[in-house]
Amino acid sequence: MARIAGVDIPREKRIVISLTYVYGIGTTTANKIAEEANVSPETRVKDLTDDELGRIREIVDNYKVEGDLRREQNLNIKRLMEISSYRGIRHRRGLPVRGQKTKNNARTRKGPVKTVANKKK
């Protein structure tokens, strides 16, 4: 297996698909990286030369991926919480941040249902 940005990428798949195993690289970015490295997107990882892998690694090093990207995202969320912006408050309370309604659903963000016992009549 070839290692790019600390991730073992599958050898049998095309380079564009394999690059998407790295956190922070999607299909569009993977295509740009392959084009920049002068590698055909159809090439399988096992068929790449060491020189081509080296070029791809150098290009990927210019992007924020894996741990650096995760760290930056966490710091951004912490900053929002520290300045007590609306988005930061929603993050702190574990509620949807982007304006979704919460009366009925939002179960992914709110967690499992906390059942409240009915008042006996």
Curated annotation (Swiss-Prot):
UniProt-listed InterPro entries: Rbsml_uS13_C (IPR027437), Ribosomal_uS13 (IPR001892), Ribosomal_uS13-like_H2TH (IPR010979), Ribosomal_uS13_bac-type (IPR019980), Ribosomal_uS13_CS (IPR018269)
Gene Ontology BP term (one): translation
Keyword line: Ribonucleoprotein, Ribosomal protein, RNA-binding, rRNA-binding, tRNA-binding
Disulfide bridge positions per record: none
GO MF assignments: rRNA binding; structural constituent of ribosome; tRNA binding
One Gene Ontology cellular component: cytosol
PROSITE patterns recorded: RIBOSOMAL_S13_1 (PS00646), RIBOSOMAL_S13_2 (PS50159)
Pfam families: Ribosomal_S13 (PF00416)
Lineage: superkingdom: Bacteria
Region of interest: Disordered: 91-121
Complex and partners: Part of the 30S ribosomal subunit. Forms a loose heterodimer with protein S19. Forms two bridges to the 50S subunit in the 70S ribosome.
Function (record text): Located at the top of the head of the 30S subunit, it contacts several helices of the 16S rRNA. In the 70S ribosome it contacts the 23S rRNA (bridge B1a) and protein L5 of the 50S subunit (bridge B1b), connecting the 2 subunits; these bridges are implicated in subunit movement. Contacts the tRNAs in the A and P-sites.
Entries under NCBIfam families matching the protein: uS13_bact
Protein family membership: Belongs to the universal ribosomal protein uS13 family.
Protein name per the record: Small ribosomal subunit protein uS13
Species of the source: Staphylococcus saprophyticus subsp. saprophyticus (strain ATCC 15305 / DSM 20229 / NCIMB 8711 / NCTC 7292 / S-41)
